[in-house]
Regions:
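Active-site hotspot residues in diverse enzymes, especially metal/ion-binding acidic/histidine motifs
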Residues: 1-129
């Protein structure tokens, strides 16, 4: 079982539905007590989307789909940063290095996320620290 399935089990109190009728620009959507995820995404992207939508459940409120509002973009950033920290914890980057993982591809496989997500996570940590 992978991290996506583990996260689904850990958060079984929230209904997660994989569907194929979300707007093209959305990989997932949090609707109060339900999360919709685009079923056509690769499993790595589903994990990233689930983590971000769970972060929205934890941190934000209301409809923030319209990103033209500064506050909506701010809330989106909060959720994304929490997803980075949950899926690519700093201590686990060190752990991966100590296990002999020295390139982006292997690091993405280690965390079961996309290479892009690993790079964004590292950039987040650079800005944070």
């Amino acid at each position: 079982m992978g991290k996506y399935e583990d996260m689904l089990i850990e958060h079984d109190y929230i209904e997660v539905i994989e569907c194929d009728n979300l707007p093209k620009r959305l990989s997932g959507l949090w609707l109060g007590d339900m999360i919709l995820i685009n079923r056509n995404l690769p499993i790595t992207s589903k994990l990233e989307t689930l983590a971000e939508e769970l972060a929205h459940n934890e941190l934000t409120y209301g409809n923030i789909v319209d990103q033209s509002s500064f506050n909506h973009r701010k809330f989106e950033g909060y959720a994304r940063r929490l997803a980075y920290e949950k899926l690519v914890p700093l201590k686990d980057i060190v752990k991966a290095f100590l296990q002999g993982i020295h390139n982006l591809y292997e690091l993405a496989n280690f965390f079961e996320v996309t290479e892009s997500f690993v790079l964004q996570s590292i950039e987040h940590y650079k800005q944070k620290y």
